[in-house]
A protein has these predicted regions:
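Active-site glycine-centered loops adjacent to acidic/histidine catalytic or metal-binding residues
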Residues: 190
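Metal-cofactor-binding active-site regions of metalloenzymes
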Residues: 1-185, 194-199, 205, 209-210, ...
């Protein structure tokens, strides 16, 4: 199968970060200058997730007003059209764009406007996932999730937890997401991206319906079996995991182990 054949296949994308998926053209337009590839992408000698996350800073500068947020939503669907994506769940952290003049409601609504425009033009259906950030306080994250809950079923489809997992384990957020579960907000959690299977266990106990990455389940057959029996989906991200050195190489990637264990 050629690259062209793969591009033609209809696709569903469930783990897409808005600020990590913007085109270079969009970033250059918003910043008013040329942007080198090295400013947006890590090199092969990237050593960790923390280093990887630094590449989100520059695109994040483009998401500090309503125009930028709306255009970002449109831009990501425009790019997906080129790869024949038919449905995508796009995630972002509203609090990273909130300003004195733009509250959380306005942030979410701006992205939704751009996504709706992209949906009409490119025929790609979408769901918007709002990310709580590990370095934010529980109070801030809870305020954001309650605000986003107002848009559930009107573009927003779920919440998430993102950021430096190695520094902020899931145990610090169980109360937040147990409360998220109580208000009827579905959620996925970035867990097991940095080697801790316990973060996956804690996420499931809090009520997560999906796990982002989940690499730390390698070799934990009982945990794989439990998640398979509960029907919890795993959002696998091989390119990211290889770049952050979560796995040593393609041959170490556990997708076959997970599939053989009944995970979806």
């Amino acid at each position: 199968m050629t690259r062209e054949d793969i591009i033609k296949l209809p696709k569903v994308e469930l783990h897409c970060h808005l600020d990590g998926s913007l085109s270079r053209e969009f970033v250059e337009k918003r910043l008013g200058r040329q942007v080198g590839k090295e400013e947006l992408s890590v090199s092969n000698d990237c050593t960790s997730l923390a280093e990887y996350l630094e590449k989100f800073d520059l695109p994040g500068q483009c998401l500090q007003d309503e125009e930028g947020l709306e255009e970002a939503g449109y831009d990501v669907l425009r790019s997906m059209k080129q790869e024949n994506v038919i449905y995508s769940e796009i995630r972002f952290a509203p609090l990273l764009s909130e300003t004195d003049n733009m509250n959380c409601n306005k942030v979410i609504e701006a992205v939704l406007r751009g996504l709706e425009r992209g949906k009409k033009e490119f025929g790609i259906d979408f769901g918007l996932i709002v990310c709580a950030m590990r370095h934010h306080s529980e109070e801030m994250n809870w305020r954001m999730i309650r605000t986003a809950r107002e848009y559930l079923g009107s573009g927003v489809c779920a919440a998430d937890l993102a950021g430096a997992e190695a520094i902020y384990p899931m145990s610090e957020f169980k109360n937040l997401f147990q409360n998220t579960h109580k208000i009827g907000m579905p959620f996925t959690i970035h867990a097991g991206e940095c080697g801790s299977a316990q973060n996956i266990i804690d996420s499931v106990e809090a009520g997560a319906r999906r796990i982002g990455h989940g690499i730390a389940m390698r070799g934990h057959s009982d945990l794989i079996k439990e998640l398979a029996e509960k029907g919890i989906g795993i959002e696998m991200c091989p390119i990211s995991n290889l770049q952050t050195k979560a796995v040593a190489g393609p041959e170490k990637y556990p997708i076959r182990e997970f599939l053989n264990g009944g995970l979806k």
